[in-house]
A protein has these predicted regions:
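Non-catalytic, conserved peripheral segments adjacent to functional cores
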Residues: 1-102, 120-122, 129-188
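Beta-rich strand-turn-strand
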Residues: 98-107, 112-117
Length: 188
């Protein structure tokens, strides 16, 4: 079992002259990685401009969401930030490029804020969630308060929603999430 709570998933692609086939989610394969959750909602987002930033979002523990994120068109930089109170890696983050071409996915468990930056125009992202959307449990932290090395040209201001512009900073955030004994580690 892999100990890192956030995991980069590299599904195998089986190709021939017609194209390729891949399994994006398999309960036994995920269980072998230590991922034990049931996904109940699939989300699909489209971002027209390059350097659109969505995040950093979560749902509070009562309706927390494990997420499995993949990019099905274009390229994104996907990030998870540890927001578990008492964690030795609180406030630390990991990120990975996900693209339609590489097929990589990022598993982000409850207790981590999630966000992504589009690296080119016309990106589509799908993600599976372990609970349905609950507006009363919706939360977030500011995208620029954690020290994330967002890969965008110097002087670029990302395209943000009005909601994401006014999220609290990490320093202002009073986390409702508790640490469960698995510190964040670099992705492998």
């Amino acid at each position: 079992m892999i100990e890192n709570p956030v995991q980069l998933i590299l599904p195998k692609r089986f190709g021939d002259s017609r194209g390729w086939f891949t399994e994006v989610h398999s309960v036994p394969a995920f269980a072998a990685l230590g991922i034990d959750c049931t996904f109940v909602q699939d989300n699909h987002s489209y971002s027209a401009p390059a350097f659109t930033l969505r995040g950093l979002h979560f749902q509070t523990p009562e309706r927390g969401q494990d997420k499995l994120v993949r990019c099905i068109r274009g390229r994104i930089y996907d990030v998870a930030v540890d927001v578990r109170r008492g964690s030795p890696t609180y406030g630390q983050w990991v990120g990975a490029e996900l693209s339609a071409e590489n097929g990589h996915q990022l598993f982000i468990p409850i207790g981590f804020a999630h966000g992504f930056l589009t690296l080119e125009p016309d990106c589509e992202v799908t993600y599976k969630c372990s609970d349905t959307y609950a507006p009363q449990n919706d939360g977030g932290i500011r995208w620029d308060s954690v020290g994330i090395g967002w890969p965008m040209p110097v002087g670029t201001t990302p395209e943000l929603s009005e909601k994401d512009k006014v999220q609290p900073t990490l320093a202002e955030f009073d986390s409702p999430f508790a640490y469960g004994g698995r510190p964040l580690a670099p992705l492998s």
